[in-house]
Amino acid sequence: MTEINWKDNLRIAWFGNFLTGASISLVVPFMPIFVENLGVGSDQAAFYAGLAISVSAISAALFSPIWGILADKYGRKPMMIRAGLAMTITMGGLAFVPNIYWLIFLRLLNGVFAGFVPNATALIASQVPKEKSGSALGTLSTGVVAGTLTGPFIGGFIAELFGIRTVFLLVGSFLFLAAVLTICFIKEDFQPVAKEKAIPTKELFTSVKYPYLLVNLFLTSFVIQFSAQSIGPILALYVRDLGQTENLLFVSGLIVSSMGFSSMMSAGVMGKLGDKVGNHRLLVVAQLYSVIIYLLCANAS
């Protein structure tokens, strides 16, 4: 068996996750403005921007089980390369779309071929020593968080200076770099999982001590993510309605980045507070707090 330095893999996977996270979030702040630039009226821009963003997530959810099966058969590294190269085309190609239909089509394909981050996570999880798995996977996850934080800020800045289409070329370059780094530096000595060792999904679910709690957490997370992600397609339009027309793209990107940055800064504090007062109470308070904040945003002037 080939000796693999998992720490080297972790560093490259972290940077790849950072580039991928930045690429995903780069386009969110100005998507409705780009939709308008493609000839869609301002009264329909929010709808088509939301469609362009959500169609990628929907197709990713539908096709991710297929890529998961192939990853179990051929390895995680090939799936990381496949995702990186495919998304280079689907995201970079957005710089050349002539109309809204091509935008929706490429966003759909982007979701179909996505999967860099989950395969990077699975690869590192399979290589890191068990006693270091928590810290290693936690470190790896910060790559996506850091990319998601900085992406909107960078995207808004570049869009103001060079135009929105230039941002898509930058995104394509980021994803291509992630694929190249994976090809050149990620090492994997993959051994397919024997069918008799694979645990059925039903058995995994029934082995959970409180399965109803898992379902409730899934539904709660779904509602929270649904609510939070619904802001992206309308944010730039809302900021413009508030009278901010100068540096609109940069301001929109800054707002998105600030939300992510505040989440990152408070995560550790909230975790400790949850251990002290109870996670259930903290979840209730956090959801009420979110309701108040969004109501205040709705009445901003």
Language model features: what each stretch is:
Residues 167-183:
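Symmetry-related core transmembrane helices of the 12-TM Major Facilitator Superfamily/SLC fold
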Residues 1-7, 188-217:
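Juxtamembrane intracellular "pre-TM" segments in multi-pass secondary transporters
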Residues 51-67, 257-269:
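Central cavity-lining transmembrane alpha-helices of secondary-active solute carriers
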Residues 6-33, 37, 210-230:
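Pair of pore-lining "gating" transmembrane helices in MFS-fold secondary transporters
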Residues 90, 101-109, 293:
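Paired small-residue
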Residues 30-46, 234-250:
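Short amphipathic helix-loop junctions that connect adjacent transmembrane helices
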Residues 106-145:
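Cytoplasmic helix-loop-helix junction between adjacent transmembrane helices
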